[in-house]
Curated annotation (Swiss-Prot):
Pfam families in UniProt: ATP-cone, Zn_ribbon_NrdR
Family statement: Belongs to the NrdR family.
Organism of origin: Carboxydothermus hydrogenoformans (strain ATCC BAA-161 / DSM 6008 / Z-2901)
Gene this protein is translated from: nrdR
Key words, A-Z: ATP-binding, DNA-binding, Metal-binding, Nucleotide-binding, Repressor, Transcription, Transcription regulation, Zinc, Zinc-finger
High-level lineage: Bacteria, Bacillati, Bacillota, Clostridia, Thermoanaerobacterales
Protein name as catalogued: Transcriptional repressor NrdR
């Protein structure tokens, strides 16, 4: 590794630790020429995750979209924003740990809904009303009945 201070290629590793929840390795290095220390990170070559939308179009996965959807669903609910970010990161981690590079927007929506259902029923219903695009009041009531009856098939 080339020293960022003097450009010398002879450096030695003085400390190695796991970083970023085990997805990276942090190394402290020391230049053998100028004795200055610096940090490097080693990460897997991150393959982009592709979302296949309902209309068949594709776009890059964006964790921020999950987070903003959670924020809207949980607006004026007693839920910390840090918890919502944690959920978005958990979903991202789960998706990246899969072998597939593509995921459908439907799968992501179901992952969000299952977590919201455990977190806050009002937020779950809010999210479901937008995500499931209920055609009428009766289909909305059916979803509420499922929720009240313990959640079969939802």
């Amino acid at each position: 590794m080339r020293c960022p201070f003097c450009g010398n290629e002879n450096t030695r590793v003085i400390d190695t630790r796991a970083a970023e929840d085990g997805f990276a390795i942090k190394r402290r290095r020391e230049c053998e020429n100028c004795s200055k220390r610096f940090t490097t990170y080693e990460r897997l070559d991150d393959r982009p995750l592709i979302v296949v939308k309902k209309d068949g179009s594709k776009q890059l996965f964006d964790k921020h979209k999950i987070y903003t959807g959670l924020l809207k669903a949980c607006e004026k609910r007693p839920i910390a924003e840090s918890k919502l970010l944690e959920i978005a990161e958990e979903i991202e981690r789960e998706l990246k740990n899969r072998l597939e590079q593509e995921v459908t927007s439907l799968e992501i929506g179901e992952m969000v809904m299952s977590r919201l259902k455990k977190l806050d029923e009002v937020a779950y219903v809010r999210f479901a009303s937008v995500y499931r695009q209920f055609k009428d009041v009766n289909s909305f009531l059916e979803e509420l009945k499922k929720l009240l009856n313990g959640g079969e098939n939802s």
